[in-house]
Amino acid sequence: MPVRRGHVAPQNTYLDTIIRKFEGQSRKFLIANAQMENCAIIYCNDGFCELFGYSRVEVMQQPCTCDFLTGPNTPSSAVSRLAQALLGAEECKVDILYYRKDASSFRCLVDVVPVKNEDGAVIMFILNFEDLAQLLAKCSSRSLSQRLLSQSFLGSEGSHGRPGGPGPGTGRGKYRTISQIPQFTLNFVEFNLEKHRSSSTTEIEIIAPHKVVERTQNVTEKVTQVLSLGADVLPEYKLQAPRIHRWTILHYSPFKAVWDWLILLLVIYTAVFTPYSAAFLLSDQDESRRGACSYTCSPLTVVDLIVDIMFVVDIVINFRTTYVNTNDEVVSHPRRIAVHYFKGWFLIDMVAAIPFDLLIFRTGSDETTTLIGLLKTARLLRLVRVARKLDRYSEYGAAVLFLLMCTFALIAHWLACIWYAIGNVERPYLEHKIGWLDSLGVQLGKRYNGSDPASGPSVQDKYVTALYFTFSSLTSVGFGNVSPNTNSEKVFSICVMLIGSLMYASIFGNVSAIIQRLYSGTARYHTQMLRVKEFIRFHQIPNPLRQRLEEYFQHAWSYTNGIDMNAVLKGFPECLQADICLHLHRALLQHCPAFSGAGKGCLRALAVKFKTTHAPPGDTLVHLGDVLSTLYFISRGSIEILRDDVVVAILGKNDIFGEPVSLHAQPGKSSADVRALTYCDLHKIQRADLLEVLDMYPAFAESFWSKLEVTFNLRDAAGGLHSSPRQAPGSQDHQGFFLSDNQSDAAPPLSISDASGLWPELLQEMPPRHSPQSPQEDPDCWPLKLGSRLEQLQAQMNRLESRVSSDLSRILQLLQKPMPQGHASYILEAPASNDLALVPIASETTSPGPRLPQGFLPPAQTPSYGDLDDCSPKHRNSSPRMPHLAVATDKTLAPSSEQEQPEGLWPPLASPLHPLEVQGLICGPCFSSLPEHLGSVPKQLDFQRHGSDPGFAGSWGH
């Protein structure tokens, strides 16, 4: 797998940088978009919300002139200066009287700072707010010694000046007076009021408020002076690569890769030559020879010294090499890198880099040879580097086999050195020359001579023979030509056989299992990567987009390690799944105010429905026109919301975007694009899943709806999938029958198409209706046209009532038994001609009754859903004159009574103003957790077709 590079894609870290610089300074600021018509507020921090008492939802999209903060005592001149500064895109300090949400007022010092993009155009404004009373209180609370010290400096300047110099009219006097005012600049560094010069509390109180206004309105500092910092203080609003410290080396840079390979070769050299040098090359004659010359006589010693220097340099480089923390962030700060290295591999690297043979050179001790040999083995600690460097290749089968073979050979080399050391140390003390070195000398004809230290086999003969013995013992071959004779040699041989059996069984016996295990993750990675590359090649994706795809895939793989969370969770029981999901989403469920007060069972049910998504910079989460079926919660990173490529809002951690589910019964469409500025982690939940859980916990639903604050509502107010049940008259979703304010709460209106399906005569006399989006109509004329249409509909209703009266005789012929007095019912008759007719059903002594005013029923007289389901016309709150609609055919016509329904009749239909809960007429979910007026939203009734249509008659049983 590739090197873990961390978050290296270009990111727009504008908001993150601002918040990070403001941390710990108690700033209250907001950000406004200068490219919008009213400079709308696109972000405000928590300090601003706490200062004024408004929530972020209430502040977003407000004009940055902050008219909602003004009151009756707010001076218009200050408001004008603020507006003029925003209009002219210039820096300004304004002292203004603002009001909090609780109607309390206070004097506020506002700093206006324009933000320019890379082209030099002002695109945003940062407005910082400070309570002037708090600033004065901070200055007055300084210690007496500090105030005396500041007064001594100011007093010496004023008392020892020339006569008339410090007068109030001179420039020096003005400067001194202004210096006594607590100066405020929008600093991103540590802000310390103790550093500002001022006089005593009494001198501060002498300055009149209008004088402060006069001096603060003429501030003309540049942005760099206002911010009092360098270039990295206020970043440009654009995609920026992660900033790296000047003298820091990236851990994935080409230089670091070459250096790592060089260090790897040096480690291998150390692992091979250190045991060989300690066992074979250090002897008494070698030590005496070294004592006669300098340290650089032996070439191998010089090479060891160079290797030690290289490892010391590597330690220094490690102190300046970036690393990736647990949040996948590239850390380049030198202090954090040093702390991380100290806690990690520093101790091992430091011990392995000590040149012990150089430190004890020419000590003159007899134990020098043994001590040097033992201390040289400390360099083997550098093998830990091999594990670190070669870990990335552990998933490749060929590399694993090669590493295993190298490990086997290295262990055999070490054992050979130990085998020779045992024979060499034991040989002088043996009475009978039976050691393996003496046997080797006899076989080679190079016997040892006690008087000649240089006698015996050569170093090469001894090393090759020892290596041959260890390899034959490890592989359990053992030809016997080199055999252990002494007890020490036999004990060592037993240990070698045990090690060999374990290595042989674990490595060579399980090669196929090792390859299969190591290939499992790599095979999945390369399979997915191959699909991505084939997709890029087939569709000819351009290089910039191709790089984004590959980087996102690699980052997503390192983020999830190729684990499919859904597949993993399916293998566990539901109770354990809920616990796992509750742990994964614990930060959101614990800190979001909307979920406070929820029981453990409710939180578990919500956690199962939540999904986690990760977005790289530049990724579009929601497009314009997308159906808003998901609610998003930001847990890390920042996003921007754009309309026509203009930023209308910037959201960060703990913000929520989508649509307020409680205000709309059906999902709407997005009115903007949502794009990630940085690497973002988001929690999302489907609308239907949220409502399903809240239906199961109705007690928590009310608390949730009241506490849920959607930071930015993406719903397009001009349209949606279905018309909202509580849309105001004049909306484009329905233009037929409109209800009054109190009637709109009771039932949704019936559209003109519904009425024309029942009575086709209406359609002939109605004027042609144009789409509200047609350019022929002016939106200002809609109320007049709607009023005229209502009058026409009223006239049509009057004519329909007269027709009902004329058809009374026909209804009387169909009655088989008398009806109770005081009630009149209406049925829809479908005779053989398949023509629908609205006719009343009444007894012979019952008059049709007075017509309904305006053709509508008051809400209290409208039948409820439960009454309709029970098919019972008994309504205590219903008027005696309220009609009950029923559908009848030639075969099922029967008298309709208020006390019973004859068999064969359809259940009584509701008022035309009510949704019908008849199977086949209504489609759509009903969520009891929604507010009462959004509980059930029917689709349009299937009454548009005329009764003569055969399909219509078939639907009623013909």
Swiss-Prot record:
Segments forming domain PAS: 41-70
Region described as Disordered: 720-751, 845-910
PROSITE patterns, A to Z: CNMP_BINDING_3
Membrane-spanning parts: 262-282, 299-319, 341-361, 371-391, 399-419, 491-511
Topological domains, Extracellular: 283-298, 362-370, 420-463, 485-490
Domain of life of the native organism: Eukaryota
Tissue: Expressed in prolactin-secreting adenomas.
Membrane-related topology note: Multi-pass membrane protein
Protein family membership: Belongs to the potassium channel family. H (Eag) (TC 1.A.1.20) subfamily. Kv11.2/KCNH6 sub-subfamily.
Annotated function: Pore-forming (alpha) subunit of voltage-gated inwardly rectifying potassium channel. Characterized by unusual gating kinetics by producing relatively small outward currents during membrane depolarization and large inward currents during subsequent repolarization which reflect a rapid inactivation during depolarization and quick recovery from inactivation but slow deactivation (closing) during repolarization. Activates even more slowly than KCNH2.
Protein name: Voltage-gated inwardly rectifying potassium channel KCNH6
